[in-house]
């Protein structure tokens, strides 16, 4: 017969001692001492009953009365009570005796500063919670409430594995007051934040990707540039759609971009420019004005070239755009509404007085007086965009288009290009004439001005007959009489001419530092001479940002600088300067192929400690190179073309063994 002996201190009670206690009442078969109780098996039932009668309440140790009773099978369901804020001085036996006054305690376990007490009956558990919650035990007020698990299942009612995924809040059939999920530990009730005694609240379901969502890519705050207040962003960007910049440039508020960017007038010249049948200008430029009617007529009637441009502003380039418009990439990169010559919001007309014509009476192309007799580009009667048809058939006022100009258009100008005064093209200081002949003339540019059909237009842009000595056009004027003319001037005399510049549109941003006529240096190396090859610009639209509208800085700033300084100012500085600690360039005599080295450099995913310079101190000289790599993004510097490790290894050889390896060893930074 199995006898339960409770209130036993298992630390100082041995099974032999307990067996000797029960031996006088019968044969003791076995004795097992647990932490706080013991089991004694006796052969005879009568002896067991006598032992229970005699030993119940016996003090085996002073102050510890034994609880001796017939052993009963563990109840299938016990009520689990959570006891929080338990003092470290409180033992499990003391806590058990505290709860046993309210009912039978099946189990009592103290875990650090909290405990779990299992009681047999629900009524006893509720009574114990009501009476003991907030009671001070050993100097601490204990927090007593029903555990979130609520009811402990016996072995016959073991929780099925599928119940672990049971919906929160489904409820427990045996104890409806608690939530249906079974959490190992309730944070709310453990820290005393529970609101009710038995209304165990189901914890909210975990967000689906909580464990994954700690990625810095998704959790970090957005970049400051994206969340800048609307007022901090330039109105240029504020009004633009994300894909096309064209329509936005036309709709930009005039407050941010100045007068020059206000919507252009819709004039006959604008329509004629867009509708030109020219081979080169027709296709790319005709389709670039999405909605010409949207241009307001409030701007001046200067036409496409000079639409509402500030007359005497020191605009730095072709585009003549204000400094605030530096965001406009280039002639060609601008959106569809800005790409064409005729549709530029501010162009030839906005150049300062020191432009091509250098006319005191006219500050720029567009603002030249109609009485001016100079036939040069800058001194035409009115301007490209706004000249009347009766004037010297200038750019904007030609009969139908570039191709359809009458042959007398340029010839009829009162003074040919070559006959201009000392300020003409050929005699300008550091003017087009001084430029080298590297760039092709206008006529040879693909899809540029010079690509216009040559036959129907004697006075057309690109292919005017060379016979006419009156500077028939920009592109193909006779080379001998007009060394400073725009187009087909001889390479020696007019290499810097309009045509030799590889088209305005094809110039990179760093080349057109100064206005065409007002460059102060005697050498134009930093100007037209440094322009890209004409094939680099198939048309205006394909250009990278050039100085005409990308720089947007007033020409006065450029005029005060030398050409070299301007080129340095416009060129991008190198990303970093090589020092002794810079990573070596990949050598050509590397036994490992350069592609392999590059793939290792780009494909490796090493931690910062492995990237640092002290990897060179490793015992194995090539261990880092031969180590396997992982594939992930690499944000280190690009591989260099040459190795300069050997150049720096001389001072290291005395005390750094790793520096003696061959020069192709890749030091990773």
Curated annotation (Swiss-Prot):
Protein role: May function as a nuclear receptor coactivator, enhancing transcription through other coactivators such as NCOA6 and CITED1. Regulates centriole biogenesis by suppressing the formation of aberrant centriolar protein complexes in the cytoplasm and thus preserving mitotic spindle integrity. Prevents the formation of the STIL-CPAP complex (which can induce the formation of aberrant centriolar protein complexes) by interfering with the interaction of STIL with CPAP.
SUPFAM superfamilies attached to this UniProt entry: RNA-binding domain, RBD
Naturally occurring in which organism (per UniProt): Pongo abelii
Phosphothreonine, modified sites: 206, 572
Biased composition (Low complexity): 287-303
Subunit field text: Interacts with NCOA6, CITED1 and XRCC5/KU86. Interacts with SS18. Interacts with STIL and interferes with its interaction with CPAP. Interacts with gamma-tubulin. Part of the HDP-RNP complex composed of at least HEXIM1, PRKDC, XRCC5, XRCC6, paraspeckle proteins (SFPQ, NONO, PSPC1, RBM14, and MATR3) and NEAT1 RNA.
GO biological process, one term: centriole assembly
Numbered residues of crosslink Glycyl lysine isopeptide (Lys-Gly) (interchain with G-Cter in SUMO2): 126, 135, 138, 149, 153, 164, 600
UniProt protein name: RNA-binding protein 14
Residues carrying Phosphoserine: 161, 220, 242, 244, 256, 272, 280, 520, 523, 527, 562, 582, 618, 620, 623, 627, 643, 649
Region span, TRBP-interacting domain: 307-354
Region (Disordered): 147-175, 193-232, 284-303, 566-592
Keywords: Acetylation, Cytoplasm, Immunity, Innate immunity, Isopeptide bond, Nucleus, Phosphoprotein, Repeat, RNA-binding, Transcription, Transcription regulation, Ubl conjugation
CDD domains, sorted: RRM1_CoAA (cd12608), RRM2_CoAA (cd12609)
GO molecular function per UniProt: RNA binding
One Gene Ontology cellular component: nucleolus
Major subcellular site: nucleus
Annotated RRM domain residues: 1-73, 79-149
Modified residues (N6-acetyllysine): 164
Entry's localization field: Nucleus; Nucleus, Nucleolus; Cytoplasm
Pfam family of the protein (one): RRM_1
């Amino acid at each position: 017969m199995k006898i339960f002996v409770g209130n036993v201190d298992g630390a100082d009670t041995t099974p032999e001692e307990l067996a000797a206690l029960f031996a006088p009442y019968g044969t003791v078969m076995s004795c097992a001492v647990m932490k706080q109780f013991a089991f004694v098996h006796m052969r005879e039932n009568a002896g067991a009953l006598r032992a229970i009668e005699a030993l119940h309440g016996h003090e085996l140790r002073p102050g510890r009365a034994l609880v001796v009773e017939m052993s009963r099978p563990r109840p299938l369901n016990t009520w689990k009570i959570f006891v929080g804020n338990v003092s470290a001085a409180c033992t499990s036996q003391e806590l058990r005796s505290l709860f046993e006054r309210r009912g039978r305690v099946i189990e009592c376990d103290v875990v650090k500063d909290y405990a779990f007490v299992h009681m047999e009956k629900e009524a006893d558990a509720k009574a114990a919670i009501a009476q003991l919650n907030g009671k001070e035990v050993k100097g601490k007020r204990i927090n007593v409430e029903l555990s979130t698990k609520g009811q402990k299942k016996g072995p016959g009612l073991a929780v099925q594995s599928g119940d672990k995924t049971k919906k929160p809040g489904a409820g427990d059939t045996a104890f409806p007051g608690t939530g249906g999920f079974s959490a190992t530990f309730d944070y709310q009730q453990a820290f005393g934040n529970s609101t009710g005694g038995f209304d165990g609240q189901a914890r909210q379901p975990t967000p689906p990707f909580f464990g994954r969502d700690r990625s810095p890519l998704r959790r970090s705050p957005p970049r400051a540039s994206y969340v800048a207040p609307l007022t901090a962003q330039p109105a240029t960007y504020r009004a633009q759609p994300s894909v096309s910049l064209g329509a936005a440039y036309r709709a930009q508020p005039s407050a941010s971009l100045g007068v020059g960017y206000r919507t252009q007038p819709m004039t006959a010249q604008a329509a004629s420019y867009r509708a030109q049948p020219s081979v080169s200008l027709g296709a790319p430029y005709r389709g670039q004005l999405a909605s010409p009617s949207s241009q307001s007529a409030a701007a001046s009637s200067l036409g496409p070239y000079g639409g509402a441009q500030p007359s005497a502003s020191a605009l730095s380039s072709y585009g003549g755009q204000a400094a605030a418009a530096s965001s406009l990439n280039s002639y060609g990169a601008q959106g569809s509404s800005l790409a064409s010559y005729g549709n530029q919001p501010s162009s030839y007309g906005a150049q300062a007085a020191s432009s091509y014509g250098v006319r005191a009476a006219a500050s720029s192309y567009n603002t030249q007086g109609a009485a001016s007799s100079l036939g040069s580009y800058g001194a035409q009667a009115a301007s490209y965009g706004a000249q009347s048809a009766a004037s010297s058939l200038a750019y904007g006022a030609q009969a139908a288009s570039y191709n359809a100009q009458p042959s007398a258009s340029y010839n009829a100008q009162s003074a040919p290009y070559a006959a201009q005064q000392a300020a003409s093209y050929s005699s300008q200081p550091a003017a087009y004439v001084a430029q080298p002949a590297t760039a092709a003339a206008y006529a040879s540019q693909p899809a540029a001005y010079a690509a216009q059909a040559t036959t129907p237009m004697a006075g057309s842009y690109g292919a005017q007959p060379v016979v006419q000595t009156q500077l028939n056009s920009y592109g193909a004027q006779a080379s001998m009489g007009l060394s400073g003319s725009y187009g087909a001037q001889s390479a020696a005399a007019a290499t810097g001419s309009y045509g030799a510049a590889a088209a305005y549109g094809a110039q990179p941003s760093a080349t057109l530092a100064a206005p065409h006529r007002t460059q102060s240096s005697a050498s134009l190396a930093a100007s037209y001479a440094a322009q890209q090859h004409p094939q680099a610009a198939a048309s205006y639209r394909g250009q990278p940002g050039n100085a005409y509208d990308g720089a947007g800085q007033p020409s006065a700033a450029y005029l005060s600088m030398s050409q070299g300084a301007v080129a340095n100012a416009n060129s991008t500085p190198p990303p970093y300067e090589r020092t002794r600690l810079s990573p070596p360039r990949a050598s050509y005599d590397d036994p490992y192929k350069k592609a392999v080295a590059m793939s290792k450099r780009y494909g490796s995913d090493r931690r910062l400690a492995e990237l640092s310079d002290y990897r060179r101190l490793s015992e194995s000289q090539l261990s880092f190179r031969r180590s396997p790599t992982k594939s992930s993004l690499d944000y280190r510097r690009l591989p260099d073309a040459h190795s300069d490790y050997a150049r720096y290894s001389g001072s290291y050889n005395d005390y750094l063994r790793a520096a003696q390896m061959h020069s192709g060893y890749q030091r990773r930074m």
